[in-house]
């Protein structure tokens, strides 16, 4: 009898063209079980067509003589659907894995996160002009060297005419980015910028930073990749993180005393990476409009942090790194001064490199370099991405000559990149390239920098 039951029950989904699911048969007395079984088999026998019947029946009125069969089929279908719903309620196989841990969503693939870099450049107002200081060129150059992206996207609301004008009449580094881009796979992509959010679209999105928050997630969600703010400078390859198997990788950030801890520990929204259509990206895109409020500047940060922290419980969906990974400093003056301002006295000595892959030798060499460094020097050895907050307020100190002098922490962190620019001819051998009006035509055109 058990084999006969299993055979008939397993045939039900096939006959009804329904997905097969495990069916739990309630435990009851033998007599009652036999009665229920006989009824179910009776329904199954009604579903079987005659030997001469065709498999296909046109969607037309059935003869009166077949009304009883139609009623039986409908009744059997209702019974099967009821059994399926009961089975799914008892064992929700799609959402629960071993030991009661939810399984990962189907939206993320099994491969690494794609090395596609995304930037967002949104107008502050209707009269805004497209401009790139040396700091932006440095950030994109470092991304090209360390991350080896297959493509770099700049998502913007500037139109094609405005972009061409900037490439023709902008200052040196603007022309270098637009008209003489060193990275041949840099793509400008026009986007629509939202102006209202909230549960009923009653919240006007005024700040360009908030508009960028919406655009970045909508842009990266379908294709995946690495999102970077313009003040984020990659310091080393992200390959270990891209290949770690997680659908989303983010890092926490520091806050300041004036914020009473409301930002400290939140996910840094200016540097993260995601697979295409990851659960993180889809949920943020779905919920960011409802969660936004102008009354709380950091509402997006809190929403993103809450989503990521909940996804950590789902295997391989989210990895959250500590503060030093992406944001070792913060945007308040006491931290920004330490990062950007030059220090008096001798320059910090250059780090000595060793030609080995042995981790013990590399660690010993790192210890020797740390003992030689200046007393004011920060340790970025555990930093992948340097989110240099408040960079726009310190542009006077973000230039080739200051960086090559090795007298600031930002200069030490980016020294190797600027030296590479010298070797490739992007800046002069003396490093005297602080004049933004210097002709961009002297730069190599469409010659992407090699990796390390």
List each language-model region with its residue ranges:
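Glycosyltransferase-associated regions of secretory-pathway enzymes
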Residues: 28, 35-212, 230-452
């Amino acid at each position: 009898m058990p084999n006969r039951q299993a055979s008939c029950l397993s045939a039900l989904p096939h006959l009804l063209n329904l997905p097969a699911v495990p069916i739990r048969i309630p435990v009851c007395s033998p007599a009652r079980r036999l009665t229920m079984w006989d009824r179910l088999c009776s329904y199954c026998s009604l579903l079987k067509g005659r030997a001469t019947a065709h498999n296909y029946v046109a969607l037309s009125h059935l003869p009166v003589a077949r009304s009883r069969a139609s009623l039986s089929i409908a009744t059997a279908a209702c019974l099967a659907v009821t059994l399926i719903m009961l089975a799914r309620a008892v064992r929700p196989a799609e959402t629960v894995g071993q030991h009661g841990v939810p399984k990962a969503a189907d939206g993320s693939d099994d491969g690494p996160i794609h090395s596609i870099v995304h930037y967002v450049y949104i107008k502050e107002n209707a009269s805004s002009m497209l401009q790139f200081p040396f700091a932006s060129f440095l950030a994109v150059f470092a991304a090209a060297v360390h991350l080896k992206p297959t493509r770099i996207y700049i998502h913007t609301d500037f139109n094609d005419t405005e972009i061409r004008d900037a490439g023709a009449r902008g200052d040196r580094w603007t022309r270098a980015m637009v008209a003489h881009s060193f990275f041949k796979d840099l793509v400008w992509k026009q986007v629509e910028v939202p102006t209202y959010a909230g549960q009923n679209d009653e919240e006007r999105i005024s700040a360009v930073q908030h508009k960028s928050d919406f655009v970045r997630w909508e842009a990266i969600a379908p294709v995946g990749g690495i999102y970077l703010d313009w003040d984020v400078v990659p310091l080393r390859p992200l390959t270990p993180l891209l290949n770690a198997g997680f659908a989303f990788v983010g890092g926490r950030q520091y806050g300041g005393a004036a914020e009473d801890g409301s930002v400290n520990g939140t996910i840094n929204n200016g540097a993260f990476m995601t697979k295409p259509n990851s659960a993180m990206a889809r949920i943020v895109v779905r919920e960011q409009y409802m969660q936004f409020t102008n009354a709380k500047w950091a509402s997006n940060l809190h929403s993103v942090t809450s989503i990521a922290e909940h996804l950590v419980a789902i295997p391989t969906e989210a990895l959250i790194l500590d503060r030093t990974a992406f944001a070792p400093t913060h945007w308040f003056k006491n931290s920004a001064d330490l990062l950007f301002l030059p220090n008096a006295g001798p320059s910090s000595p250059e780090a000595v490199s060793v030609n080995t892959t042995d981790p013990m030798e590399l660690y010993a060499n790192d210890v020797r370099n740390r003992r030689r460094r200046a007393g004011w020097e920060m340790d970025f050895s555990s930093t992948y991405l340097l989110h240099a907050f408040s960079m726009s307020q310190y542009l006077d100190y973000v230039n080739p000559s200051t960086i090559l002098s090795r007298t600031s922490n930002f200069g030490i962190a980016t020294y190797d990149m600027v030296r590479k620019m010298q070797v490739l001819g992007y800046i002069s051998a003396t490093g005297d390239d602080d004049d933004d009006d210097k002709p961009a035509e002297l730069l190599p055109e469409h010659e992407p920098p090699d990796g390390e």
